[in-house]
């Protein structure tokens, strides 16, 4: 816990102490102290509505209660400069900001660990995200899901959760048969032979590339093989090619996975039959009209769902239930799925299945990733100018750069539609948020280099009484808010909270830089203290950028 968090806790305790001293309530009656940061600086550093919360207990008007709390409050212990009462009884606290300088050495000593909290207390969470069919390139929705999912995992880990990142490989469905048939067509074409493309075949450039590679490596060997043997080989070859490409693309996008889980393994290991039997034993499965049904309405779904069709084939739902049962059998406390907007209607039946298996409500959470629209020169862009086809993740990275893609996708709430401005993403101006943040980091590194050239190294054991300007205190307050931003992002599953924080920190840094002189040759002690403040800012900004997968350049 850093000094800013400690002082906030002290302030809460002193508010309780003032309530007791004023005789407004017994200790057991005092509600949790809520502290908010006012939007306007003129309203103080913190504000509480404790007076309104106590009105019924104390049987007094909130404003009178607020006056009694203020009169009984010990300002010294909580480093309070002054207090005032606003509106019906809000109490505003103005801090004596000198305590903030204690934050500098604590950040310097914590280094890459600064921002870590333990709100997760080691809870085991599995996050499954991307999970695109291995039949083509990753599109914009996949890219946004990858960026959001990875940032969420990083934030959860920083907040003390035990996180596992998983990619579910859809390698057992009809789409893989179609992949094999499509590869076969392109293989024959590469040999100058004709074969009709299936109506629902895959026509991407990658399939053409697979066909050409097969022709180069094996010649016409497969033309003369039995179709079943040829299909089996093309299925395996095509799947491996596409998976290798997916892994490579995601690795280049700075999105690692701990587990790549094959759907086929559910069939091979008997997991599907086990899941069906588990539901049957609990009385949630019945037979009707020749089909096997899951009684999902018991758990809030709008209708019961078919698990096995009349022809004996499984619906998508049964293997998915088996997969989620397997996740929980592996010992995870909570599951988070990051799904595309087209899966919205699928959520109630999956949550029903988890409950039907005997797990508590809320064990499965689903984060929905909404659609992305690209804009260039103010116009909506549907196709890539280079390929004439839908824009892929690779295309977007080539167009604006990896950092811009990661930052922009982590910048908005995932469940809102996103307009991605390509011109803004490549502009070198303060209007471009990723440039603004990275330039702040590079600017700090430049100042630290200048200090080193003059023999001025930042350290944790300096005299920080030189830090006393309003801009310095604003910067320190923002630095002190990083652990809280991480905690909120983790608890609410909103990684964009960190991106918002990055912008606030960059703004505070630029504002300080434009108002103050960091290195003063006439005052080396003050210069070293300010360079230490710069180092603390650099550590915080770097740690925050890492959480969303964006680099922190030392030069720009």
UniProtKB/Swiss-Prot annotation:
Signal peptide residue numbers: none
GO function terms (MF aspect): arginine-tRNA ligase activity; ATP binding
InterPro entries documented for this protein: aa-tRNA-synth_I_CS, Arg-tRNA-ligase, Arg-tRNA-synth_N, Arg-tRNA-synth_N_sf, ArgRS_core, DALR_anticod-bd, Rossmann-like_a/b/a_fold, tRNAsynth_Ia_anticodon-bd
Compartment(s) of residence: Cytoplasm
Superkingdom field: Bacteria
Keywords per UniProt: Aminoacyl-tRNA synthetase, ATP-binding, Cytoplasm, Ligase, Nucleotide-binding, Protein biosynthesis
Main location: cytoplasm
Gene3D superfamilies in UniProt: Arginyl tRNA synthetase N-terminal domain, HUPs, Isoleucyl-tRNA Synthetase, Domain 1
Gene Ontology BP term (one): arginyl-tRNA aminoacylation
EC number: 6.1.1.19
GO cellular component: cytoplasm
Catalytic activity: tRNA(Arg) + L-arginine + ATP = L-arginyl-tRNA(Arg) + AMP + diphosphate
Xref: PROSITE patterns: AA_TRNA_LIGASE_I
Motif ('HIGH' region): 132-142
SMART domains according to UniProt: Arg_tRNA_synt_N (SM01016), DALR_1 (SM00836)
Family from the record: Belongs to the class-I aminoacyl-tRNA synthetase family.
HAMAP family cross-referenced by the UniProt entry: Arg_tRNA_synth
Record's subunit section: Monomer.
Protein's recorded name: Arginine--tRNA ligase
């Amino acid at each position: 816990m850093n000094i800013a968090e400690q002082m906030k806790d002290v302030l809460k305790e002193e508010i309780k102490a003032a309530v007791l001293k004023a005789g407004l309530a017994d200790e057991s009656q005092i509600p949790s102290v809520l502290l908010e940061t006012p939007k306007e600086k003129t309203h103080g550093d913190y504000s509480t509505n404790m007076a309104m919360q106590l009105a019924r207990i104390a049987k007094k008007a909130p404003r009178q209660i607020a006056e009694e709390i203020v009169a009984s409050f010990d300002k010294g212990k909580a480093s309070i400069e002054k207090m005032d009462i606003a509106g019906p009884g809000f109490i505003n606290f103005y801090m004596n900001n000198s305590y903030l300088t204690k934050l500098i050495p604590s950040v310097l000593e914590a280094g890459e660990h600064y921002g870590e909290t333990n709100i997760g207390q080691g809870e085991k969470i599995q996050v499954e995200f991307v999970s695109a069919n291995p039949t083509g390139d990753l599109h914009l929705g996949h890219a946004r899901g990858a960026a959001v999912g990875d940032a969420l995992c990083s934030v959860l880990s920083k907040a003390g959760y035990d996180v596992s990142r998983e990619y579910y490989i859809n390698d057992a469905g009809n789409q893989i048969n179609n992949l094999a048939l499509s590869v076969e067509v392109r293989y024959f074409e590469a040999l100058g032979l004709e074969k009709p493309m299936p109506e629902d075949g895959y026509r991407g450039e990658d399939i053409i590339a697979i066909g050409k590679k097969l022709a180069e490596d094996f010649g016409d060997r497969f033309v003369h093989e039995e179709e079943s043997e040829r299909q089996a080989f093309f299925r395996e070859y095509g799947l491996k090619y596409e998976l290798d490409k997916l892994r490579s693309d995601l690795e280049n996008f700075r999105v690692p996975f701990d587990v790549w889980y094959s759907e086929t393994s559910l069939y091979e290991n008997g997991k599907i039959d086990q899941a069906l039997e588990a539901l049957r034993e609990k009385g949630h499965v019945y037979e009707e009209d020749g089909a096997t049904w899951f009684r999902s309405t018991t758990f809030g779904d709008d209708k019961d769902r078919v698990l096995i069709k009349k022809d004996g084939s499984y619906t998508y739902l049964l293997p998915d239930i088996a997969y989620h049962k397997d996740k929980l059998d592996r010992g995870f406390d909570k599951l988070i799925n990051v799904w595309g907007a087209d899966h919205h209607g699928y959520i109630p039946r999956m949550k029903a299945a988890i409950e039907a298996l005997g797990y508590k409500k809320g064990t499965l959470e689903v984060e929905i990733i909404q659609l992305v629209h690209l804009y260039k020169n103010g116009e909506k862009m549907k196709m890539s100018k280079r390929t004439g086809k839908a824009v892929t993740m690779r295309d977007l990275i080539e167009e604006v750069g990896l950092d811009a893609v990661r930052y922009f996708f982590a910048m908005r709430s995932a469940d809102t539609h996103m307009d991605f401005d390509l011109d803004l993403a490549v502009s070198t101006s303060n209007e471009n948020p990723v440039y603004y943040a990275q330039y702040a980091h590079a600017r700090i590194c430049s100042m630290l280099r200048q200090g080193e050239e003059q023999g001025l190294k930042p350290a944790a054991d300096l005299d920080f009484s030189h830090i006393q300007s309003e801009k310095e205190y604003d910067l320190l307050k923002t630095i002190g808010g990083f652990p809280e931003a991480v905690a909120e992002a983790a608890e609410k599953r909103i990684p964009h909270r960190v991106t918002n924080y990055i912008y606030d920190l960059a703004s505070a840094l630029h504002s300080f830089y434009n108002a103050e002189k960091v290195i003063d040759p006439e005052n080396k002690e003050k210069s070293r203290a300010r360079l230490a403040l710069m180092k603390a800012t650099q550590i915080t900004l770097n740690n925050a950028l890492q959480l969303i997968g964006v680099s922190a350049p030392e030069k720009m």
